[in-house]
Amino acid sequence: MTRVVLAAAYRTPIGVFGGAFKDVPAYDLGATLIEHIIKETGLNPSEIDEVIIGNVLQAGQGQNPARIAAMKGGLPETVPAFTVNKVCGSGLKSIQLAYQSIVTGENDIVLAGGMENMSQSPMLVNNSRFGFKMGHQSMVDSMVYDGLTDVFNQYHMGITAENLVEQYGISREEQDTFAVNSQQKAVRAQQNGEFDSEIVPVSIPQRKGEPIVVTKDEGVRENVSVEKLSRLRPAFKKDGTVTAGNASGINDGAAMMLVMSEDKAKELNIEPLAVLDGFGSHGVDPSIMGIAPVGAVEKALKRSKKELSDIDVFELNEAFAAQSLAVDRELKLPPEKVNVKGGAIALGHPIGASGARVLVTLLHQLNDEVETGLTSLCIGGGQAIAAVVSKYK
């Protein structure tokens, strides 16, 4: 079977809600990475066969945001593109689709990843097209409804985390401790420059003066403690334990990678970072969607012909501390190998981009001692996706 390799992998810094990227469309974030990858690899843009990009909150952006990003990123009009929506798994699903298209021989070179600007998601006025006869009308927050609400139960993703709290007997202190650890690891990694190799700075033009250049993730917080987090009120349930402090944030960002057949990489003298070994997807009851990574991880390992003990490093998306703790309990993961540079609770969770972001962060950890990695994300609606990669040899 054709070996599929990852030849370049980058991400933007992750902006907080209403932060540095609030006026930067998702497709501009994606375009920045596309342009960088082309420049970095020296690849002829016309040699790219397809562009596949995850993006969840598409309302108001224009037709096919992936195509917009591709064209603005400098690709010729002959290169096709399409947008993927698998909620939080969109970015990783895009990479899987790229992988599948190369294995089947349809493509040789694909740019794949994810992008999201949650700050720019519009408010919707449903049923207004033909006018209102009378009475009050309300707006729907497209970010909350299309990105963060379980449509089957009509409640926020946070309630699915509360459901896992009850099912697994997870305490508030455990969640807050997990969140503090995520922040501390991210602070340490940021201060040590461990994200520098994976981040492409984003230049934001200003009406007056020089552009603002964003180089670091905005959500990383120093001096976070369990004591401080314990003062926060429950966010989703009156007597609940899930708070803004032990859940991932609402964020803006993008991540992208160059997916190629090994033969094409050799032909073009491009040195790959890693080999894609296999993927797994799984579904569960939507009310406990956060536990779905367990099944996805098991499938990805089986298809990759690997055991959990073979994995040197894990990048698992931290949608909620409770969700992450539940998955850890089921899989019995070694904590020293999981999210060693912090996770989404600290870094942020731009939903359409996160699937690619966790893989980018994972790839930049591979070396002669850390050769095999696994990444996974839970997905609203009761799903999950996972991937296994190995350092290229």
UniProtKB/Swiss-Prot annotation:
SUPFAM superfamilies: Thiolase-like (SSF53901). InterPro entries: Thiolase, Thiolase-like, Thiolase_acyl_enz_int_AS, Thiolase_AS, Thiolase_C, Thiolase_CS, Thiolase_N. Disulfide bonds: none annotated. It is an enzyme of class 2 (transferase). It is found in: Cytoplasm. PANTHER family: ACETYL-COA ACETYLTRANSFERASE, CYTOSOLIC, ACETYL-COA C-ACYLTRANSFERASE. It holds the Pfam family Thiolase_N. Keywords: Acyltransferase, Cytoplasm, Transferase. Belongs to the thiolase-like superfamily. Thiolase family. Its EC number is 2.3.1.9. It comes from Staphylococcus aureus (strain NCTC 8325 / PS 47). The active site is at C88 (acyl-thioester intermediate), H349 (proton acceptor), C378 (proton acceptor). Coiled coil: none annotated. The keyword Cytoplasm applies. This is Probable acetyl-CoA acyltransferase. One of its GO terms (molecular function) is acetyl-CoA C-acetyltransferase activity. It comes from the Bacteria. GO terms for cellular component: cytoplasm. It catalyses: 2 acetyl-CoA = acetoacetyl-CoA + CoA.
